[in-house]
């Protein structure tokens, strides 16, 4: 149970993603005066990309919840507002929380500036058009999510709540007329896109995914015909596609687009200037540590910080 604070502080939070929302909620609930700045016109940050991935539609409800909590606990929400160091200094805040998230990491590959190349943010956030043949560089959580997203036909987007669609895909016999509750033959559909999911490491793809769900994600992608390539050396991106060395052989993956999902770097450009100005400043979420996008970890870290301030 959160204890009310003895001394109310004036706190600025920059970034309304999972970490910024969690901190603002917990700090305001304890009695602090919180102003939350967000450069976009809506709250959510990375959640706004995650909720577009099949099976993660429930994040929309998470955002609705946080939106209500901001109102309930009096968080002053400033959307569409990009703040600079001077803005925060003029605000005379007791403490500043930077929950500014991450930037996609761009690998050093010959031809990385080719028009075929898209970042995962171009696909999930900006709605870039993607061709039918795709290579995904990076097979962590983001690479898997982007692959799942690209496999869905936009004209048949599921809400994630349609059991009939799930049963059909996996051959579940809802009539219970057959032994084991499975149909004799699953009607396989042609995948919406042809996808190569690639990683540099020679280990199994998706090894860092959840222990209880990683196998399911791998199975789902394999069922949809995704080609999973480990131990890949990237040589070049050109008009023909992505040139790689795999199993000692050089080959060209003839694709329309190459999607970069090779990690992130912290977005913390405000930190040095604020620290130099003597402001008590904290980094949370991806701005603190840019590992695989981890909303649960970011929310926990931000909440624990709010309980200490």
Predicted regions and their residues:
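Short, hydrophobic/aromatic-rich segments at coil-to-beta transitions
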Residues: 238-242
